[in-house]
Amino acid sequence: MKLSYTEIFKHSDILNPISATSLLSAGKLAQLEPKSTILDLGSGKAFPSLLWANTFGATVEGFDINRDYVEYANSRAKMLNLSNRVKYSCKDIRKLRLDKKYDVVAFLGLGMTQVYGKNSDVLKIFESLLNKDGILILAEPVWLVKPVSSEGLKALGEAETSFLTEAEMRHLMGESGFQVLRHYVSSKEDWELYVRPVYIAMQEIMKSKSQLADEAQKIINGFKAEYAAVGQHWNMLLWVAKMH
């Protein structure tokens, strides 16, 4: 039996190591306002897009494959009195077909190649969903240097092709028709706030469901490896880029 993302991130609001401060700064840079429309792809528990909707008055449409997360996100929207302009739906974003465009597309930390495949193809998908001069807000892990050591790849359970370096990412965006306005680098504290709730959730599993203790410990070890690799092999960057 495998633990679900719902169980792993039971106590987590945001499912990646990005601070609310960075998200608010990104929203300001994107010039979010009440008439802005946001598409949140892989919305998770929707902390970022709910923050933008609540702060800037934007309208949000989000999609995630996890039904528990979608129900949670919609309940949060209702609690914040945002249901009239914020809605989340349960769909596989890889199969999503939309016939409209948005002012902002957000894709936060899912991993472009893991979800869509080739990086350049992913950016074309985002471009097709944006209005003229639209903004892409993208969170993506980056390698600090290449080649990545075999020890680092093994510890993270990743291939070197999983992610780009910062320079490669910036170059790819430029080639794909995006002008990078700014990027925000996750701090060690951001990562601590990301991994700590997972440790708590897994420790609860280990105490209450002994048959899942080994699986829970593996998950803890995986998150510890991610945290240890920050500043050594990789980090998370939040990009704000304008289509041109």
Feature locations, PLM:
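Conserved alpha-helix/loop element of class I SAM-dependent methyltransferases that forms part
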Residues: 16-34
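Short, glycine-/aromatic-enriched active-site segment of Class I SAM-dependent methyltransferases
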Residues: 141-160
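Conserved class I S-adenosyl-L-methionine
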Residues: 36-44
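Class I SAM-dependent methyltransferase SAM/SAH-binding core
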Residues: 48-94
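A short acidic, Gly/Pro-enriched loop at the edge of an enzyme's catalytic core
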Residues: 97-105
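Conserved Class I S-adenosyl-L-methionine
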Residues: 182-244
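A short glycine-rich, Lys/Arg-flanked "PGG" loop and its adjoining helix->strand segment in the class I
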Residues: 120-135
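A short SAM/SAH-binding and catalytic strip from SAM-dependent methyltransferases
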Residues: 104-118
